[in-house]
UniProtKB/Swiss-Prot annotation:
Catalytic activity line of the entry: alpha-ribazole + adenosylcob(III)inamide-GDP = adenosylcob(III)alamin + GMP + H(+); alpha-ribazole 5'-phosphate + adenosylcob(III)inamide-GDP = adenosylcob(III)alamin 5'-phosphate + GMP + H(+)
Superkingdom of source: Bacteria
Location in or out of the cell: Cell membrane
Function: Joins adenosylcobinamide-GDP and alpha-ribazole to generate adenosylcobalamin (Ado-cobalamin). Also synthesizes adenosylcobalamin 5'-phosphate from adenosylcobinamide-GDP and alpha-ribazole 5'-phosphate.
InterPro entries: CobS
HAMAP family attached to this UniProt entry: CobS
Requisite cofactors: Mg(2+)
Protein name: Adenosylcobinamide-GDP ribazoletransferase
Keywords: Cell membrane, Cobalamin biosynthesis, Magnesium, Membrane, Transferase, Transmembrane, Transmembrane helix
GO cellular component terms, semicolon-separated: plasma membrane
One of the record's GO molecular function terms: adenosylcobinamide-GDP ribazoletransferase activity
């Protein structure tokens, strides 16, 4: 378990972990990915809090600073998936053509627009959450990683030619998925001003991420690393935006 956790940290962050190079990303590290999400979420909340002290409550600068730190710590891994997936979904043609577009090194207009939208929404939502419930930032980042576990549940195929997809797609048993969803719902209760707001936010977020992944499976023939990254970022964004909106009710 510790080796899987080390691999998950090495895969999803810039943190070097001993022995992680000998363990490829697979079932165990994917199961442990929400732990990495919790750590990243705690870091994001701390940065947002510090930014609010410097720039003032609800300042967009604190939110954008938080997003910037997350991008650095994660090497922009998931946001790159957002760009590639958006370009693939915006491509006409069969799945093979869409996958080729996703593997291309350049970013098209769909990808650029998707990245700008995700970064802007996350930054503004994080800034709002510094005044209405900073724990919601941790919850949002965690929800993205729990969504990744859900996307990799049993019977979900990998897209043809996807190295990461072939290692993680279909690896997560139903009890593991259910356990992480239960944990996410439990920790979401105190994340908002009212106990019902956090659970609603994460349910909407996880559903959005799962729906995107399901559409990508239909469009591309399976899951890729880019699809996982886009599902993570979409769930994180939807959770933060939804909770920021609900918290003002």
């Amino acid at each position: 378990m510790m080796r899987s956790l080390a691999t998950a940290f090495a895969f999803a962050t810039v943190i070097p972990t001993p022995g992680s190079a000998t363990t490829p990303m697979g079932r165990g590290p994917m199961t442990a990915l929400p732990v990495v999400g919790a750590a990243l979420g705690a870091l994001a909340a701390a940065i947002a809090w510090a930014g609010a002290q410097v720039f003032g409550p609800s300042s967009p600068l604190s939110g954008m600073l938080t997003v910037a730190v997350l991008l650095v710590v994660t090497r922009g891994l998931h946001i790159d998936g957002v760009a590639d997936t958006a370009d693939g979904l915006g491509c006409y043609g069969p799945p093979q053509r869409a996958l080729a577009v996703m593997r291309d090194g350049s970013t098209g207009p769909f990808g650029v627009a998707a990245v700008v939208l995700v970064i802007a929404l996350q930054g503004l939502a994080f800034a709002t959450l510094t005044t209405v419930g900073i724990a919601g930032i941790t919850l949002a980042v965690l929800s993205g990683r729990v969504t990744a576990v859900l996307v990799c549940r049993r019977l979900v195929p990998a897209a043809h030619g996807s190295t990461l997809g072939s290692r993680v797609a279909g690896t997560q048993p139903a009890p593991v998925v259910a356990a992480w969803l239960a944990v996410l719902l439990a920790v979401s209760v105190p994340a908002g001003p009212r106990p019902w707001q956090g659970p609603i936010a994460v349910l909407v977020a996880v559903t959005a991420g799962a729906a995107l992944a399901a559409h990508c499976v239909h469009r591309f023939g399976g899951v890729t690393g880019d699809v996982l990254g886009s599902a993570i970022e979409l769930s994180t964004t939807v959770s933060a935006v939804t909770l920021a909106g609900l918290a003002r009710l």
